[in-house]
Structure formats: C-alpha cells, structure tokens
Amino acid sequence: MVTRKVATKREAEASGAFPIVGLGASAGGLEAFEHFFRNVPRDNGMAFVLVPHLDPGHASILTEILQRSTAMPVVEAQHSMPVAPNGVYVIPPNREMTIFHGAIQLSVPEQPRGHRMPIDAFLRSLAEDQGERAIGVILSGTGTDGTLGLRAILGAGGVSFVQDPATAKYDGMPASAIQAGYATYVLPVERMPEAMLTSARTLAVNRESPPTDGSSLNRILMLLRAVTGNDFSQYKKTTIGRRIARRMSQHDIENMEVYARYLKEHPSEVQSLFKELLINVTSFFRDPEAFAALRTDVLPQMFAGKPEDYVLRVWVPGCATGEETFSLAILMHELMGETGHDFKVQFYSTDLDEDAIGVARAAIYPPNIVQDVLPQRLQRFFVKEEVGYRVKKEIREKVVFAIQNVIKDPPFTRLDLVSCRNLMIYLEPELHDRLVRAFHYALKPGGVLFLSPSESIGDHDDLFAPLSREWKLYRATHSVGATRDVTPVGPSWSSESDSKPPGEPVKITKETHLAELTKRVLL
C-alpha cells in the first residue's frame, strides 16, 4: 500500500528546480490518465498536476482510482500546497486551480458551469510561473479547453504533448490543439512518459550549459537567414538556445554541431525551427490593469480636440494572431461611443509569422476566449459561430494586417500610438536600443508607446516621458536634443501617385504585404 506523503514547502524547495507537468482531460480522460501513469517510473524527477473536467456537485474518487496505476503518491490538491517531484496532484471538484511560486492556488470558479476552461487557466498560470520548466499535456476530451494553455506554455519556452487523436476516446481537445499548431509531440498516451523524460533531460542539459558552441550556433543562424531571409543573431542567446534545444529533443539530438548538420541535410527542419523561434503568445486584454490604465489615463487626452476628419493611426508590431490589436480597437470604439468622438481610427498590425497573420485576418477565435473577454464585450463585438467567435465587421474593418519584419523593415510614421508588447524582452540590448529609437521615429510628437510590464525604454529618457511606469506607457518627446537617427535596412518607402488619402478605407486582401500596404496607406 502506498503512503500518501505530501511534501512540505521546505522539502519542495530543497528538491530544487524540476519540471511540472499539467495534464488536462475531459470525456475519456480517466482511461488516458491510467495508461499514462502506468508508464511513468516512480523516481522521474517531475511533478504531475491533473486538471480533468469533474462534476462540481459530486465528490471525486479520482485520487483513489489513479493510485492503483502508480507508485507515486496521488493526492487531492489543497490551497497553498507546494508541489514536489515524484508526486501527483488532482484538482478538487468545483474549484479553479492555478500555481504561484510552485504552490497550488485554489479558488471558487467565477464562470458558470459550461463556460469554464479550467485546463487553460491552469496551463496559463503554469507557463507564467515555471517558464521553460512547464510541460503541458492534453488528453482525451471534447471541446477546445487546453489549446490556449498550450500556446502559453510554448511561448514561455516549455514543451507540449498531445494525445494522438486516433487513440483518444474523444478527439475534440487533442484535435483542437494540433490544428492550432501548439503540439510539440503527438503520441499515444503510453509513449508520452518516455518521450517526456528524454525531452526533460535534453532541455536540462542545455539549460545548465547555455549555447557555448558559437561556431555551431552561428552556422544554424546563418542557415536560417539563408533559407528564410530572417536574422535571429540579435535575439537573446538564451532564448534561441532553449528553442533550438526543444527542436533537438524532438529528434533525440543532444549535440548542437550534430543538429547543425541535420538542418543542412533536412531543409524542412529549417522551416520547423523558424516556426519554433517565432514567439507567438498573446490573448485578448492581456494584463487587464494595463488596458484599464490606457483607457483611463491616456486615451481621453489622445482623443481630446480631434476633429471629425482626423485619422488616428495605431501600429501594432509583432501582433501575432491579432488579439492585442482587436483589444485596442474594442477599447477605443467603446470610449469613442461614450465620449461622442466620431473620427476614424486605422490600425496597422504586422508580424513576421505568415500563419499568425492568416489567423488574424480571419478574425475567428476559439470558444476559450470567454476567459479573457467580458460577456458584454462578447455579445457586443463578436458573432458566435460553430468553431468559436468571429470579430464583428465594425471592428475588423478598422484593421489592416500585413507581413513585416520589424527588425529590418522601415517603421511606419506619423503615428498616434505604437503598441509593442512582449517582443523586446527577447532581444539583445543593441537591437532593443534600435527598436526603441525606431518607435520614437514612428510616433508623432506626443504619441504614445505601450509596452508590456516586463519591458522598458532602457536609457532613453531623452526620447520618452513616462505616463505610467507600472504599466509601461510612455509619451514621445521630440525636443531639439532628442535623437532620431533611425536608419532602416529595408527598402525605402515613398508616396505613390495612386496612394489612397489617409481617411479612405483600405481594401484588405489575403495577399496584403508590408510593401503593398505601405504604398496604399502610409503617407
């Protein structure tokens, strides 16, 4: 008989850093959990946190059932309980679960039953709390819960495992994650533990020994530039190294020199690595307090005194799949309605990832967005469809999406607002400095720069004045001493005779690219 010893906080801390695995399942999940844990060795060095969809009105016996399938202790999670390696923790019924500093946090769900996404909620918190040590697993189940959680884990440098839909009793959740492109591994449940342990070992080796093989890393970066046209040499080496290691682990390669040769021999892997390096993590109204500060402290002054024929111009570089852009568009639309302003707002939303831009242009998002969008906003600005929610035309038509490399392509100009959140944290100081100057160049005098809470303008107090240090809102200052020496390396932009006037709507096509967009709407 297994004694269910729960680790104390001191014991958990003494065990050091270790991977934490979040497993989500719905219908058919019990069978999948059993098969999974029968193949997990007791001394595996990982903690497992289970988030099944449970009946909120009945006590759960899942811990007793799963204890038969593993030698590890299986316990029902308690509030503030620290997780420790070689242990299994199960969410209680009718509770929402997150993790903070390695300890379980429980709360009463705010959403009514049927609208809850407990797997997404936990995996998102796991990504934020554990970063590259987070592992997300989606098993059998209906619906889409877990898809956005896996996206957060991948964006934080973690790894995701999804049950092969052909082996799942219900394939809805696995299929959703795979179709969205958020599955690092797609495997039958029985094969997951071995692959998970191998991946954890490979990533641990690379984490403890950051990329020191400069020649191999340079060969990889040069190959990426030659094949994709994009230079990642000014991205932080730790970030690049982790993402290369994640691709290496999928091919059971532990040596970067070997992986460099593998890339040269397998051109398709170059594209896979390129997609791996594209940081694509976003959500509607991410950091709600920051959006509240923008709405209360910045936008009213920005709107004040604008005539009806004014065109307020917003650029969202690194827009990913468009949630941030549409959040800003909704926020501005609401405030304009409340204050009686009737000028036009035009968004230029750009990203390097062609697939992400395709999702943004379609403006259709999964049902999971109910976690991030208030019910009144869902009803006002979205149309419910079979696959999720579509952004309404009145918001969608404000935005032009285009493919752009913000690092090498010239910036837009004469902008009122630049919103670039969670991109510069991945850049080396020199490139970060160039980008801050580029944003200053792009903004009108008094224009606003909106960054994420983890970013800053660095040592550029001569270019920007803080509006909110907490929520990283800055006003561009264009004094005589302010430097505006931005030298873009891409093609120069000039006015074309057939350019549309600023207030005229831009026709959006599937093929809209930055160069074409520039000719039509920039000047």
Which residues does each predicted region cover?
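Class I S-adenosyl-L-methionine
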Residues: S233-G241, M248-W315, T325-L331
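Conserved beta-strand signature within the Rossmann-like core of class I S-adenosyl-L-methionine
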Residues: P445-P453
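Glycine-centered, small-residue-biased loops immediately flanking beta-strands
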Residues: G158, V345, G447
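Extended basic-aromatic, gly/pro-enriched interface segments that bind polyanionic ligands
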Residues: P317, E338-L417, L423-P429
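Conserved acid/base catalytic micro-environments in cytosolic active-site loops
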Residues: M1-L277, R484-W493
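Conserved SAM-binding loop of SAM-dependent methyltransferases across substrates and taxa
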Residues: T321-T339
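PAS-family sensory modules
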Residues: V2, H478-L523
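A short glycine-rich, Lys/Arg-flanked "PGG" loop and its adjoining helix->strand segment in the class I
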Residues: H432-P445
